[in-house]
């Protein structure tokens, strides 16, 4: 197989792991594109993206245009004369002229089994919706949002213990392997593009802090899915004792209860059991303001008076 001349475009750690796989392959990464350096940390010091840091470590040229819509940036990219451009969590829109520049076009690594969960938050929405599996799709890019022809798909079961954080790690391992496999198929012509079924498509909207507020009028199962989807960001929470209390881990039971939604049924070392519109939510790990996440047993030792049976979390204390 003749090595491909690759432009890699990506920004966060998830992208850097794919770049590392390409560096370790027989292909030639001739340039990287990544977001401009951003202020980070307490000192707001300009910080390079993980992709830039890795590229510099391997002496790969780095380009950081604010946009790829202007002719100068497009000409700069065309002059690289790449065979293919690989895009993983880059963060900039690629206009059609850029998509058409490399000989084999541009391909993208997307964290879902397309056409399900197109858009910004596919990993989180799979958990939020209660999906039983997720995966990675290697896709030929077009001008739509994750609408291009599919080149390769992998599948990953979603476990009851999975959170967005754990799925992110699993897909960050699965994605690079799938990408290298897809490049082999593209090079030897064995990979056949498959169109997406538009009737199965849906959109993975970005998460918001407001959406992370626990609504006890939902079912216990849905709240359990929310808590897993919103870990590690924005983290599910409820308000009680004039405090925002984050919930990191929970379980649920479909067993019906007579108490009003939001009522504490029991508070023990095993967890805080709360009535919902359908079933019971059992909170296992919480975080009080300005504190670290702790097991419920430790929180009850310090704030047991906040979480007694019969207290309704829908009613804030004065």
Swiss-Prot record:
Keywords, A to Z?
Protein biosynthesis, Transferase
Q: What is this protein called?
A: Methionyl-tRNA formyltransferase
- Source organism of this protein record: Shewanella frigidimarina (strain NCIMB 400)
Annotated residues that bind (6S)-5,6,7,8-tetrahydrofolate are located at 112-115
Protein biosynthesis found in the keyword field: yes
S-S pairs: none
**One Pfam entry name:** Formyl_trans_N
Q: Which reaction does it catalyse?
A: L-methionyl-tRNA(fMet) + (6R)-10-formyltetrahydrofolate = N-formyl-L-methionyl-tRNA(fMet) + (6S)-5,6,7,8-tetrahydrofolate + H(+)
Q: What does this protein do?
A: Attaches a formyl group to the free amino group of methionyl-tRNA(fMet). The formyl group appears to play a dual role in the initiator identity of N-formylmethionyl-tRNA by promoting its recognition by IF2 and preventing the misappropriation of this tRNA by the elongation apparatus.
- Example GO molecular function: methionyl-tRNA formyltransferase activity
Per the UniProt record, which EC number(s) apply here? 2.1.2.9
What PROSITE patterns has UniProt attached to this entry?
A: GART
**Family that this chain belongs to:** Belongs to the Fmt family.
Q: Which InterPro entries match?
A: Fmt, Formyl_trans_C, Formyl_trans_C_sf, Formyl_transf_N, Formyl_transf_N_sf, Formyl_transferase-like_C_sf, GART_AS, Met-tRNA-FMT_C
Instruction: Offer a single GO CC term for the protein.
Output: cytosol
